[in-house]
Design a protein with these regions (language model features):
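Conserved beta-strand-loop-alpha-helix hinge in the C-terminal portion
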Residues: 165-191
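Helical segment within the ABC ATPase nucleotide-binding domain
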Residues: 124-136
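Conserved ABC transporter NBD signature motif
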Residues: 1-7, 170
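Q-loop/switch helix immediately C-terminal to the Walker
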Residues: 36-48
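ABC ATPase NBD coupling module
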Residues: 8-22, 52-59, 176-181
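H-loop/switch region of ABC-family ATPase nucleotide-binding domains
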Residues: 145-146
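Catalytic Walker B motif of ABC-type/P-loop ATPase nucleotide-binding domains
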Residues: 109-112
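ABC ATPase C-loop
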Residues: 101-102
Length: 203
């Protein structure tokens, strides 16, 4: 079963889960509509899980709110509200998707290898933004990654899986003291495997 905030959401339809879960996908192109403006994408995110009727799409008050939220990303997007999202870089789109996923303060935020398609410098920026957004909004977050270095550096609990089973579960001070070689050794011992590919080591 999948339990969120005390409720079983295992079989909830996607439109109902949308008000509970925020998601950022691996592909920067998946979380936004490239043919719509930044403010229009944000408006859709704000209305996630709500009944929609016929009214003006974006009020001035909303526009001011989006401006302030975008300013927190420190990417200059607050002055590009009417820019079509398709004109943004992959890193900008992923940062926007992260912001959109957290506008409604979801019960759980899912980050599905959300930096895997980005260059190392941009990936680091998006990870830093993720940490800041999660901390400021006190969000329960699950980040999926094959990068051991990132798994150690981010979050307060680290879980490794092998063949669908949890084989490593470490948190607190033990996690803070971890190194990549330590983690490789733990995984090898728990899974019985001596293989660790480059993706796990470097991302």
């Amino acid at each position: 079963s999948i339990i969120a905030d005390g409720n079983d959401i295992t079989y909830l339809p996607d439109y109902k889960r949308a008000s509970i879960l925020g998601r950022v996908f691996q592909d920067p192109m998946m979380g936004t509509n490239p043919n719509m403006m930044i403010e229009e994408n944000m408006a859709l995110a704000m209305r996630r899980g709500q009944r929609r009727g016929l009214k003006w799409g974006i009020s001035q008050k909303e526009r001011e709110f989006y401006h302030e939220q975008l300013k927190l990303l420190k990417l200059g997007l607050e002055d590009r509200l009417t820019t079509k999202v398709g004109l943004l870089s992959g890193g900008q789109r992923q940062a926007l998707t992260l912001l959109m996923a957290t506008l409604k303060k979801p019960k759980v935020l899912l980050l599905d290898e959300h930096t895997a398609a980005l260059d190392p410098k941009t990936a680091e920026k998006v990870l830093d933004m993720s940490d800041r957004v999660v901390e400021e909004n006190h969000l329960t977050t699950l980040m999926v990654t094959h990068n051991m270095k990132d798994a150690i550096a981010h979050g307060n609990r680290l879980i490794m899986m092998d063949a669908g089973h949890i084989v490593v579960d470490i948190s607190g001070e033990d996690k803070k003291k971890l190194t990549v070689p330590d983690l490789m050794a733990l995984f090898s011992k728990a899974s019985g495997s001596t293989e660790a590919n480059d993706k796990m080591l470097l991302g």
